[in-house]
């Protein structure tokens, strides 16, 4: 009879701990995956955007740097 309250208390103490650790692992994985995706998107998008802006500014200032000629 004494084991039942002890078991219930231990169950209540242990059960909230499991979802938090799983939740934390999932959040860490999502953060890492998001950073990896962000790095790939940033490199391609940012560098090509910079090259396009630099090319358009160069073509406006001096037409000898344009690749269209």
Curated annotation (Swiss-Prot):
* Tissue expression: Expressed by the venom duct.
Which residues belong to the propeptide?
20-54
| GO annotation, cellular component aspect | extracellular region
Instruction: Identify the Pfam families for this entry.
Output: Chi-conotoxin (PF16981)
Modification comment: Contains 2 disulfide bonds that can be either 'C1-C3, C2-C4' or 'C1-C4, C2-C3', since these disulfide connectivities have been observed for conotoxins with cysteine framework V (for examples, see AC P0DQQ7 and AC P81755).
Q: Where located?
A: Secreted
Q: Where is the signal peptide?
A: 1-19
Please state the protein's primary subcellular location.
Answer: secreted
Q: Does the keyword Amino-acid biosynthesis apply?
A: no
Which keywords describe this protein according to UniProt?
A: Disulfide bond, Secreted, Signal, Toxin
Q: Which GO terms describe its molecular function?
A: toxin activity
Domain comment (free text): The cysteine framework is V (CC-CC).
Q: Which family does it belong to?
A: Belongs to the conotoxin T superfamily.
The name on file for this protein is Conotoxin Lt5.7
């Amino acid at each position: 009879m004494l084991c039942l309250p002890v078991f219930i208390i231990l169950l209540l103490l242990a059960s909230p701990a499991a979802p938090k650790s799983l939740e934390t692992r999932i959040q860490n994985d999502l953060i890492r995956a998001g950073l990896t995706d962000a790095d790939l998107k940033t490199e391609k998008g940012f560098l090509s955007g910079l090259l396009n802006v630099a090319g358009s500014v160069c073509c406006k200032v001096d037409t000898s740097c344009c690749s269209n000629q």
